[in-house]
A protein has these predicted regions:
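Rhodanese-like catalytic fold shared by cysteine-dependent sulfurtransferases
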Residues: 1-37, 45-86, 94-138
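Short, surface-exposed ligand- or partner-binding patches at beta-edge/loop junctions that are enriched
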Residues: 89
């Protein structure tokens, strides 16, 4: 018997968008210029490598989000312990809405997400830096 999904992705994203702030790329650029935000890139590392990233953005995949936010987790990241606004983005705006809602539900505040994601950032003329893989010394 096939699974019956009772709440699909559209309902989940709509719920997230109703709960959290959605910012335009221009608003994110303005906030980033002031330096009082952390831009969180939740795209897969392969997407970042292929498409580049917003300069200064902190990369955190969706799979590690809760573990990196929780200060009591052995995987907690200092980037999530700052008294700043957290603006999440993905490629198109759906995953970042879900990530921002999760962060908000965990108590990380204030949070927002960038509507339209990285595609909207590029279209708005936002700065993009090429992916620079970490190198190891022999």
């Amino acid at each position: 018997m096939a699974q019956i999904i009772t709440r699909g992705i559209k309902a989940l994203v709509d719920e997230a968008n109703a709960q959290i702030e959605t910012m335009t790329p221009q608003q994110v650029m303005s906030a980033a210029a002031k330096g009082d935000v952390v831009i969180v890139d939740i795209r897969d590392p392969r997407e970042i490598e292929r498409d580049g990233r917003i300069p200064g953005a902190f990369a955190c995949t969706r799979g590690m989000l809760e573990f990196w936010i929780d200060p009591n987790s052995p995987y907690a990241k200092p980037a999530f312990q700052q008294d700043k606004k957290y603006i999440f983005h993905c490629a198109g705006g759906m995953r970042s809405a879900l990530a921002a809602k999760t962060a908000d539900d965990m108590g990380l505040k204030p949070v927002a997400h960038m509507g339209g994601g990285f595609a909207a950032w590029k279209e708005a003329g936002g700065d993009i830096e090429a992916f620079a893989p970490k190198t190891t010394k022999a």
